[in-house]
Curated annotation (Swiss-Prot):
Keywords: Cytoplasm, Kelch repeat, Nucleus, Repeat, S-nitrosylation, Thioether bond, Ubl conjugation, Ubl conjugation pathway. Residues 184-286 form the BACK domain. It comes from Rattus norvegicus (Rat). Ubiquitin ligase activity of the BCR(KEAP1) complex is inhibited by oxidative stress and electrophile metabolites such as sulforaphane. Electrophile metabolites react with reactive cysteine residues in KEAP1 and trigger non-enzymatic covalent modifications of these cysteine residues, leading to inactivate the ubiquitin ligase activity of the BCR(KEAP1) complex. Selective autophagy also inactivates the BCR(KEAP1) complex via interaction between KEAP1 and SQSTM1/p62, which sequesters the complex in inclusion bodies and promotes its degradation. This is Kelch-like ECH-associated protein 1. One of its GO terms (cellular component) is inclusion body. The Kelch repeats mediate interaction with NFE2L2/NRF2, BPTF and PGAM5. The modification S-nitrosocysteine is found at C151. There is a cross-link at R135 (N5-[4-(S-L-cysteinyl)-5-methyl-1H-imidazol-2-yl]-L-ornithine (Arg-Cys) (interchain with C-151 in KEAP1)). It is found in: Cytoplasm; Nucleus. The keyword Repeat applies. Pathway: Protein modification; protein ubiquitination. The record marks C151, C257, C273, C288, C434 as: Sensor for electrophilic agents.
């Protein structure tokens, strides 16, 4: 082969003159020339000759446009698709095999793998509506499709049949945008039938997140008993309380009672009945006609009612937690003065979110969660202008990123404890000025009312509070004279307190929580030193046992349990307001530092609930 002659001077063709005249001399870097229609690249070859590559950028679009014109005018077509669907008259569409094969793996296999259709001029197609096939053929030529909501399911089904993934994704995205309580189950079932995993998952997630609304729709009542049992068994079902799930099951049975009454017992075992309140169970046992007609179901619920009211230890009921994630919230706190911060920590990625501030700065407050809502109870506003003990109860909604005021406590309570039984908040002890409370009051969110219950046997401020087996435990604190190691337990059915085994260590301002059916007391102040020791109470043996100590001494700390681990946040070590956050792993009996607060502080209110709505946060932070 003869080598290409080296160009000398300008090429003979004058149309290349602008290109060649701009080529720099010597063997340098590649030079790119581009226009709106094409681009050319000049590069040196190994033998010193220059070559160029030329690309017409819109050639493919133009070529397919011409092929579409040929299709519409029935020129150069090499196949006719004869499409028959149910009782609809067959329709014929002329096309080019190469174009169909380029857009659909099914057509490619049909026309290239030696199948009988490869040599056929007329190919019969069944199982797809002619209008759908017409649109898919148009898409093969134009890369564009327009689908109305009434026929999107048919188009998506056809795109799945012919493996046109881009159309499947477009239809899936459209259907996700159309999800609402009335159609989510139908879309989920359709996606499962055609094997569209992503759409099926998105529709199921919508059902879980909007269960309360979905359970009122016709599609819900058309579920089979197996489908319903599977649905209500989900941990990520988003409900305010388990009674929503119970009512949904009873309503489903009532929809066709003669046929469905046989499934009541199986459904009740999928409901987390131990998460129902005794009062609710008692009402249903007395008034629900479905239960009255089924002795086995009635006996089953009576047994659960007795276990709850007798406070028997039961297997831990898995918490319903939507997959939006659960974060550790810290409200208020103290550093030189009371703070109004509300922040949330995500242990899964170590990030912090700054959320809507408390309406009034507070420290020494309690944090509680009912129905996914975060409540800030009592506290004190320490400010340069003076100190004011608070009787306020404020409610934070993660979905709106907003606080709203609720009914006030009967008395101000600084450094009180808070716990939740049967959806009711208990505010325990605390102080108002020099008055140290033994009183306890209960808040009913549905009525927005506080009511006093039996007082503790001991006055306590800086008291740690925990709830286990529907019993309220008050641990340690300060009675106005002495720091305490005593602890007592409240029985709501009897409305009375009883002393339990005292702790091994005097602790005021300790962090108290429940993990794996044990009560943990971490840190605190014994009257001389801040503590880093931790002990736990076994309700079965009624004994306190030391576990591994924290890395830092701390009192007035925040504490929370998240995914089987204990987190302690901030506090005071006797010299410094801490910003450290430690995590306890019960499997290894070890503490580790995992993150830091955005600033040191003590006396924070801490609780765990769902992740806030990012859209609301972004909108409220927007200064546009």
């Amino acid at each position: 082969m003869q080598p290409e002659p080296k160009p000398s001077g300008a090429p003979r063709s004058s149309q290349f003159l602008p290109l060649w005249s701009k080529c720099p001399e010597g063997a340098g870097d590649a030079v790119m020339y581009a226009s709106t229609e094409c681009k050319a690249e000049v590069t040196p070859s190994q033998d010193g000759n220059r070559t160029f590559s030329y690309t017409l950028e819109d050639h493919t679009k133009q070529a397919f446009g011409i092929m579409n014109e040929l299709r519409l005018s029935q020129q150069l077509c090499d196949v006719t698709l004869q499409v028959k669907y149910e009782d609809i008259p067959a329709a014929q569409f002329m096309a080019h095999k190469v174009v169909l094969a380029s857009s659909s793996p099914v057509f490619k296999a049909m026309f290239t793998n030696g199948l009988r259709e490869q040599g056929m001029e007329v190919v019969s197609i069944e199982g797809i509506h002619p209008k759908v096939m017409e649109r898919l053929i148009e898409f093969a030529y134009t890369a564009s499709i327009s689908v109305g909501e009434k026929c999107v399911l048919h188009v998506m089904n056809g795109a799945v049949m012919y493996q046109i993934d881009s159309v499947v994704r477009a239809c899936s995205d459209f259907l996700v945008q159309q999800l609402d309580p009335s159609n989510a189950i139908g879309i989920a079932n359709f996606a499962e039938q055609i094997g569209c995993t992503e759409l099926h998952q998105r529709a199921r997630e919508y059902i879980y997140m909007h269960f309360g609304e979905v359970a009122k729709q016709e599609e819900f009542f058309n579920l089979s008993h197996c489908q319903l049992a599977t649905l209500i068994s989900r941990d990520d079902l988003n409900v305010r309380c388990e009674s929503e799930v119970f009512h949904a099951c009873i309503d489903w049975v009532k929809y066709d009672c003669p046929q469905r009454r046989f499934y009541v017992q199986a459904l009740l075992r999928a409901v987390r009945c131990h998460a129902l309140t005794p009062r609710f169970l008692q009402t249903q046992l007395q008034k629900c006609e479905i239960l009255q007609a089924d002795a086995r179901c009635k006996d089953y619920l009576v047994q659960i009612f007795q276990e709850l009211t007798l406070h028997k230890p039961t297997q831990a009921v898995p918490c319903r937690a939507p997959k939006v994630g659960r974060l550790i919230y810290t409200a208020g706190g103290y550093f030189r003065q009371s703070l109004s911060y509300l922040e949330a920590y995500n242990p899964s990625n170590g990030s912090w979110l700054r959320l809507a501030d408390l309406q009034v700065p507070r420290s020494g407050l309690a944090g509680c969660v009912v129905g996914g809502l975060l409540y800030a109870v009592g506290g004190r506003n320490n400010s340069p202008d003076g100190n004011t003990d608070s009787s306020a109860l404020d409610c934070y909604n993660p979905m709106t990123n907003q606080w709203s005021p609720c009914a006030s406590l009967s008395v101000p309570r600084n450094r009180s404890g808070g716990g939740v039984i049967d959806g009711h908040i208990y505010a325990v002890g605390g102080s108002h000025g020099c008055i140290h409370h033994s009183s306890v009051e209960r808040y009913e969110p549905d009525r927005d009312e506080w009511h006093l219950v039996a007082p503790m046997l001991t006055r306590r401020i800086g008291v740690g509070v925990a709830v286990l087996n529907r019993l309220l435990y008050a641990v340690g604190g300060f009675d106005g004279t002495n720091r305490l190691n005593s602890a007592e337990c409240y029985y709501p059915e009897r409305n009375e307190w009883r002393m339990i085994t005292p702790m091994n260590t005097i602790r005021s301002g300790a962090g108290v929580c429940v993990l794996h059916s044990c009560i943990y007391a971490a840190g605190g102040y014994d009257g001389q030193d801040q503590l880093n020791s931790v002990e736990r109470y076994d309700v079965e043996t009624e004994t306190w046992t030391f576990v591994a100590s924290m890395k830092h001494r701390r009192s007035a700390l925040g504490i929370a349990v998240h995914q089987g681990r204990i987190y302690v946040l901030g506090g005071y070590d006797g010299h410094t307001f801490l910003d450290s956050v430690e995590c306890y792993d019960p499997d290894t009996d070890t503490w580790s530092e995992v993150t830091r607060l955005t600033s040191g502080r003590s006396g924070v209110g801490v609780a765990v609930t769902m992740e806030p709505c990012r859209k609301q946060i972004d909108q409220q932070n927007c200064t546009c």
